Amino acid sequence: MGKPRPHKKKASKTREKSVLSAGGSISKRKMNEDPRKLLEQATILLQTGQADAALSIAQQALEIATSNSPAQLSSLNTIAEIYVELGEIDLARKHFLQAVELDPTGSIPESEGGGAEKFLWLAQLSELGGKDSVQWFEKGVGALRGIFRRSPLFFIAFSRASYQADIFRWEEDAESRCENLITEALLVQPSSPEVLQTLASIRISQLREDDARAALSRSLELWKDLPPEDPHVPDFPTRISLSRLLMEVSMLLEALEVLERLILEDDQSVEAWYLGGWCLQLLAEIGEAPRDPEAESNETPESKRHASLVASREWLKQSLMLYDLVQYEDERLKEHALELVEAMNKELGEEMEDDSNVEDGEGEGEEEWEGIESDSDHEMADS
C-alpha cells in the first residue's frame, strides 16, 4: 500500500508567510545559520509529527539559502513535502514547481537537493490528473534511470514511484508499464528491502496477496536480525510503510514485531503507537495474541483476545497522549484511535486511573509491554 493522496485544504495565509514577511528582515543570527542544519532540524520535526514547527524552520533555511544553490533546492523540496503533510496541496505544488525550475531534468544529485522525487510528487498532486500526471511520472522515471546504476538512493525514490501506479489505470498498458519498472529495479538490486516493498504494494493492487506476502517476507529477512545502527536497516518511514503493508495482507504478528522495534528506537512516534494498537486489535478479532515464549500453551482464544485488547488499548492511549503532546495533525488517525478505544472500553470496562501509567511507562502498562516486546497515508485509517 502506497502513500495515500493527501486531502486538499484551504491554504493557510499564516503558513504561507515567509520569514521576511513575518519580521521584515532576517537577523544576523539567522544569516549565520547553516541552511543544511536547519533542514535537518525541520526533517526531524516533520518525522515526529510537528509539521508546523518544521515549516517555520524550513522557511528560515529557504530565506538564508544562496540563490540557485543546493540549499535553496533542498529547502524548496522540504517545504513542499511539509505542505503535503499539512494538506496544503496548492502550496506544495507551488514549491515543487519552483524546485523543477532549478532542476528541470532531475540531473542534480539528490545529495544536493535534486533528483526525481519532485516529479513523482507532482504526478500525484496534479490538478489535471490523467495525461498531466503521466507526463510528470514519466519525467520522474527518466530521471531515475539516469541514476539507476550509480546510486542506492534510487531505491528510496523508486518506492515513491510505485505510489503513482493508480494514475495509469485509465491506460490499457498500465499493468505492463508497472511490471517493467519493478522488473528493472529488481534486476539491478534484487535484495533491496525498499524495492521488495514496492513489489508487494503492486501485488496487493493486483489482488495477488500470496505474492505480496512472499515479497514482504523476503524484505523482512534482509534486515530484521540486524542492529538498529546497521546501514542496511531501512529508515523509519520505510518501516512504518512496511508495517501497514504487513497489516494489509494479514501478517499481523510480523507487523507488530516491526512496530515494537520502531517504538524501541523512537517512543515518541504517534503513528507507530497507533498502528501497533490497531494491529493488536486486529489480532484480538481473530483470537490471537502477540508471541510470548512464556505464555501457557493451553491459552484459549478468549484469553488471547483479552490480552490483545488490553495491550491494544494501552498502545492506542499512548498514541493519543503523544498526539496531544506533540500537537499531531492527523485527525483521521485520532478519530480512529478514539473509536477503537471506545469499543474496547465497552468490552473491557473503563480502565482505572492507577491500573497503568501510559505517560511514564511504569506499572502494569510496562509489564504488558515486556510481554509483547520481541526486540504513519493514512489510507488504512479510512478503511
From Swiss-Prot:
TPR repeats lie at residues 35-68, 73-106, 116-147, 193-226. Signal peptide: none annotated. Keywords: Chaperone, Cytoplasm, Nucleus, Repeat, Ribosome biogenesis, TPR repeat. Gene3D superfamilies: Tetratricopeptide repeat domain. It is found in: Cytoplasm; Nucleus. Residues 350-374 have a biased composition (Acidic residues). InterPro entries: TPR-like_helical_dom_sf, TPR_rpt. Residues 1-33, 345-383 are annotated as: Disordered. One of its GO terms (cellular component) is nucleus. The keyword Chaperone applies. Residues 1-12 have a biased composition (Basic residues). It holds the Pfam family TPR_12. GO terms for biological process: cell division; ribosome biogenesis. Coiled coil: none annotated. Acts as a chaperone for the L4 ribosomal subunit, required for hierarchical ribosome assembly. Shields ribosomal protein L4 until timely release and insertion into the pre-ribosome is possible, once ribosomal protein L18 is present. Belongs to the ACL4 family. This is Probable assembly chaperone of rpl4. It comes from Emericella nidulans (strain FGSC A4 / ATCC 38163 / CBS 112.46 / NRRL 194 / M139) (Aspergillus nidulans).
